[in-house]
């Protein structure tokens, strides 16, 4: 399994181990799927900024605003062709940091969650309806728990 990380935005230096966090999260997501991951699978993760992800979001989703993560699954190749590209996950720094602050999470944990989320999208998970969302969120919770990260969907405790 090859996972390439490109850090496009220097601001990610505020989280010095961002590339390692992203790789660990993607590996955990893929490991959770076992045999569903094709032999020779590879993917890329791009750590970018809000300006770049806004352009991509506008181009590919007709939404002219930044978002936290985008996933671009690769076209399927015949079985046995190696390498098997899974696709690309792109994460926006400013949105990750602002959401983490608003949700009382660490940026590292939020980044890991978004990479897990994006990687699951590459593997065919979706959240277009309630059943799909429940299945995807359950998978995310399990994967993140294995990384020592609390349930990202839990409401903060009042107090």
UniProtKB/Swiss-Prot annotation:
GO MF terms held by the record: metalloendopeptidase activity; RNA endonuclease activity; zinc ion binding
Tell me where it resides.
Cytoplasm
Question: Where does it mainly reside?
Answer: cytoplasm
Q: Which cofactor does it need?
A: Zn(2+)
User: What's the protein here called?
Assistant: Endoribonuclease YbeY
E.C. code = 3.1.-.-
Q: Which organism is it from?
A: Azorhizobium caulinodans (strain ATCC 43989 / DSM 5975 / JCM 20966 / LMG 6465 / NBRC 14845 / NCIMB 13405 / ORS 571)
Q: Which InterPro entries match?
A: MetalPrtase_cat_dom_sf_prd, YbeY, YbeY_CS
Keyword Zinc found = yes
Q: Example GO biological process term? A: rRNA processing
**Signal sequence bounds:** none
């Amino acid at each position: 399994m090859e996972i390439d990380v490109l850090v496009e935005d220097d601001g990610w230096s505020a989280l010095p181990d961002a590339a390692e966090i992203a790789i660990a999260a993607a590996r955990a997501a893929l490991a959770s799927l076992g045999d569903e991951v094709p032999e020779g699978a590879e993917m890329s993760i791009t750590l970018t900024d809000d300006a770049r992800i806004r352009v991509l979001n506008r181009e590919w989703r007709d939404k002219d605003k930044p978002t936290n993560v985008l996933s671009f699954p690769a076209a399927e190749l015949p079985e046995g062709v190696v390498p098997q590209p899974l696709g690309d996950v792109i994460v926006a720094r400013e949105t990750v940091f602002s959401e983490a602050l608003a949700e009382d999470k660490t940026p590292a944990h939020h980044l890991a969650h978004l990479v897990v989320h994006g990687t699951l999208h590459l593997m065919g998970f979706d959240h277009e309806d309630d059943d799909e969302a429940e299945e995807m969120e359950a998978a995310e919770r399990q994967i993140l728990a294995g990384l020592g990260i609390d349930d990202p969907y839990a409401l903060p405790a009042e107090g």
